[in-house]
Amino acid sequence: MNSCIIVLRLLLSGPFVFAPAWSYNLDVRHVQNFSFPLAGRHFGYRVLQVGNGVVVGAPSEGNSMGNLYQCQPETGDCLPVTLSSNYTSKYLGMTLATDPTSDNLLACDPGLSRTCDQNIYLSGLCYLIHENLRGPVLQGHPGYQECIKGNVDLVFLFDGSMSLQQDEFEKIVDFMKDVMKKLSNSSYQFAAVQFSTYFRTEFTFLDYIRQKDPDALLAGVKHMRLLTNTFGAINYVAKEVFRPDLGARPDATKVLIIITDGEATDEHNIDAAKDIIRYIIGIGKNFKTKESQEALHQFASKPVEEFVKILDTFEKLKDLFTELQKKIYVIEGTSKQDLTSFNMELSSSGISADLSEGHGVVGAVGAKDWAGGFLDLKADLKSSTFVGNEPLTVESRAGYLGYTVTWLPSRGTMSLLATGAPRYQHVGRVLLFQQPKRGGPWSQIQEIDGIQIGSYFGGELCGVDVDRDGETELLLIAAPLYYGEQRGGRVFIYQKIQLEFQMVSELQGETGYPLGRFGAAIAALTDINGDELTDVAVGAPLEEQGAVYIFNGQQGGLSPRPSQRIEGTQMFSGIQWFGRSIHGVKDLGGDGLADVAVGAEGQVIVLSSRPVVDIITSVSFSPAEIPVHEVECSYSTSNQKKEGVNLTVCFQVKSLISTFQGHLVANLTYTLQLDGHRTRSRGLFPGGKHKLIGNTAVTPVKSCFVFWFHFPICIQDLISPINVSLSYSLWEEEGTPRDPRALDRDIPPILKPSPHLETKEIPFEKNCGEDKNCEADLKLAFSDMRSKILRLTPSASLSVRLTLRNTAEDAYWVQVTLSFPQGLSFRKVEILKPHSHVPVGCEELPEEAVVHSRALSCNVSSPIFGEDSMVDIQVMFNTLQKGSWGDFIELQANVSCNNEDSSLLEDNSATTSIPVMYPINVLTKDQENSTLYISFTPKSPKIHHVKHIYQVRIQPSNYDNMPPLEALVRVPRVHSEGLITHKWSIQMEPPVNCSPRNLESPSDEAESCSFGTEFRCPIDFRQEILVQVNGMVELRGTIKASSMLSLCSSLAISFNSSKHFHLYGRNASMAQVVMKVDLVYEKEMLYLYVLSGIGGLLLLFLIFIALYKVGFFKRNLKEKMEANVDASSEIPGEDAGQPELEKECKDPGCLEPLQKTDEDGSGGD
């Protein structure tokens, strides 16, 4: 079991920045490392800064011995620390602690083992060493357990004084019988002596050998009832009972159990019993005071807390054997009947340690069945007091209390100690104890439990006095095996609030290292950054090859984010377990800067802190104001030389670490920028640059530099000053590792983590006359608004025009506010020519800023609207379809500026009203099935029924105030002299009553369509209406000549046009049907047909006579055709040549007429 505890401890800190390390403020470029190859890979397991050097612990590996090594930064060498001891120390260096008040060193080996009757006892070996490592060395064995296995000769020395009642006396006898019976089969021998004024041996070892029956041996015991001569009784037992002739064994362990109810009535010494293990049991009411209890200590073996037991009643004697059973072994975790558990046999005392003001404590994780506890060491290390769980419960078993211990300094009267039990109930626990500083019993005051199983909560503890006032404000509790959010390990911060520590926050490492062991080492550093607050370092040895985080102190606690993360590989390749141990409270280099020692596998790295500095800067201008004439547009046409402004910048470095003694030089990179917050700068350095970058070396002596800048022409913003910003940072060259012996060499400083920026402003001159006070007079009016009407079409827009004048001096930050109704939506604003160069920008104010309306805020000619200036502003709006409108909309405008007197505000406002017209969306058309043509003939019917059908579609309106609609239907006029007459009626769906009205006759009777009657029909807002015009057309005379007439009807939708308009124009709500009437005149045609037939026959006869005369009917066409067939049937021979052309044309029917013609014309060949 001893190996398990120590190996676990090694693993927790063994193989155990935010990207690569930030540079604040440990120097990772110039480091020093120490190693001692023969010490093995555990060299660096523990590091402590002692005196002017570093003490390194190197527990053993394999069968080698552990040791301490002293490393001197001045020489770079490490040498073993010589300790005179008769003990082999395998794990020496596993535990180191230093006293911050005296610098003494406490070094412990928790694995000191020895054999006791074939069993292994495990306790500690500790050394208290002077800070120079050469002075006297005190040696102690905390938790050392006497070996009482093997042969044991045990004597009961029991009180027989008169203060004992008979029943109490009998209970003592029963207790002795019970012990003897339970140990009857062991290697124990017993004897018993009653003491009072005199001493009487009740039975000897020889008697017990002969007769092992306790009842028989103690049957004759009689109560003596006299005084209590304890000193004499002890000497009597040593001389007269432990005698070989009375059965005592020479090789047996001598044990004396003293049972008494009062203080001794005699005085003497007990030197004769110094080789006897003495237990004393005080029973009864006589031991209530501290003095009476301490009186028993002189009779007991050391440590007295292990060998003195106080019982308030005699009834508790019967349960006391359970404690005696602790001297009989049982394997951890088992429970065998009649066997006992461990007490201090496997205490591993010294697995942790702390030292403060000469008061040392060491952890004893194996005590009390590995419930654990700690030992309060006396100054000489020879004795100690065990403190553990009170009361000792089953739950605390195997909790490893004492795995870590740390003092929590306090200015009060009580000493405060925290100790961890990382295996308590698998989640871990930390207990806080207190003790009066003048000495006295320990008392447990607080329990803090972990939350995650297996996290090893309490595996590392650290008290932090943030403001260094002697009072511990923070308790840091590590859980290096905690897992969450891909982070391995966590440190919980508990703050002392009144009398208890309460959790306030936590620290954690970088993501991506679930096994990083963040918190395996925690160290409260001295102030390394010059803010006079304690800083903290946290090790994570398994984040890659190891990392160390630096958390700076802040008022009331620690910064939640690290100021620096240092990876071991930044300094040395191949490094392992960097951050397994940390200590940083001293200046090892003699330069006034704190150094931090960090343990790794087989080596120790010493990191030097860098001097933290602040740069004192100053910026001034000459002249103090920018001349306005240099930025006016007219200045560009002149040949005047630009005067510009001289800018003076001064630097001075100041160290924030008062102890720093080196030469201070800061290599500074600075940047000067003009109007850096603007896209276009109003100031320019030579070469047209708005930014200058430079380098300089800064010392504590003030140094200044002068720069010149000028201005571009036509600057519009002449109100706000030009911003001049100075930013700076430090730069350093890559260098070789700094030799700590070269104290006169400059140490590169580092800037404190604050904004390294200074901003100054240089204003413009004000052109406001001699009094330098500009007074403006603004006037605002709407213009060109008489013909404005807002027609609410779907894409309706509205433009309003404002005229703004300034009749006095320059106006600063002119702002026009325009209120408009909810139904309008701002689209854009523009300046009308010839003032288009004047800038204007508008934005709509939040709706909560205005009530029942909306508003625009427009900046005009920002920031200056010059004297005697005028500008026309056109603002354009879109309309919202679902807006609420009245008959008019009202717009209100107001103008203001920063420098107009209140008596001149009368003409700063303007109001206008614009009529609103609402759309009517009505579409009408005639139907295809209307009658478009009729005809009258003498033989046709005299009456025709006709119909004209119209369809009316009315689209729903988005507005509520719709007017009444009328359908106006007009029908044709009846001409009194015409051949036809007609009658008309109106039919509508849905039905309505229409009222007819005669129309006046048109002046032009020849008009194609003439209307005589108009029907007025009220209609509702329905989606569709059908209108049918029915007519009867009658022929009332005789048709004497053919003619064509047109009869027309029309439909129009009418409404009040003063507030409404046709959305798609008036024509869209009108339709007309034109019907043609054909009058056909018919004559008698029979005689014409007869004469035409006779003429046709006569013409045919004349044609026949002509054909006969020319011989058409006399040709022998048939014979010619047959001859031609015969000729074509002949087959020519193979050698027949090409046919002759003359032979091809022998057809008489074809050629005869031509030949005849030739003969007639030429007379032949």
Swiss-Prot record:
Ca(2+) 3 binds at D587, D591, D595. SUPFAM superfamilies: Integrin alpha N-terminal domain (SSF69318), Integrin domains (SSF69179), vWA-like (SSF53300). Integrin ITGAL/ITGB2 is a receptor for ICAM1, ICAM2, ICAM3 and ICAM4. Integrin ITGAL/ITGB2 is a receptor for F11R. Integrin ITGAL/ITGB2 is a receptor for the secreted form of ubiquitin-like protein ISG15; the interaction is mediated by ITGAL. Involved in a variety of immune phenomena including leukocyte-endothelial cell interaction, cytotoxic T-cell mediated killing, and antibody dependent killing by granulocytes and monocytes. Contributes to natural killer cell cytotoxicity. Involved in leukocyte adhesion and transmigration of leukocytes including T-cells and neutrophils. One of its GO terms (biological process) is cell-matrix adhesion. Residues 1123-1165 are annotated as: Disordered. The integrin I-domain (insert) is a VWFA domain. Integrins with I-domains do not undergo protease cleavage. The I-domain is necessary and sufficient for interaction with ICAM1 and F11R. FG-GAP repeats lie at residues 29-80, 81-138, 335-386, 387-442, 443-503, 504-560, 564-624. GO terms for cellular component: external side of plasma membrane; integrin alphaL-beta2 complex; integrin complex. GO terms for molecular function: ICAM-3 receptor activity; integrin binding; metal ion binding. Gene3D superfamilies: 1.20.5.2120, Bicelle-embedded integrin alpha(iib) transmembrane segment, Integrin alpha, N-terminal, Integrin domains. Chain A, domain 2, ntegrin, alpha v. Chain A, domain 3, ntegrin, alpha v. Chain A, domain 4. Residues 153-324 form the VWFA domain. Residues 1-23 form the signal peptide. Ca(2+) 1 binds at D465, D467, D469, E473. It is found in: Cell membrane. Residues 24-1084 are extracellular. Belongs to the integrin alpha chain family. It holds the Pfam family FG-GAP. This is Integrin alpha-L. A motif (GFFKR motif) lies at residues 1111-1115. Residues 1106-1165 are cytoplasmic. In resting T-cells, up to 40% of surface ITGAL is constitutively phosphorylated. Phosphorylation causes conformational changes needed for ligand binding and is necessary for the activation by some physiological agents. The chain crosses the membrane at residues 1085-1105. Heterodimer of an alpha and a beta subunit. The ITGAL alpha subunit associates with the ITGB2 beta subunit. Interacts with THBD. Interacts with CD226. It comes from Bos taurus (Bovine).
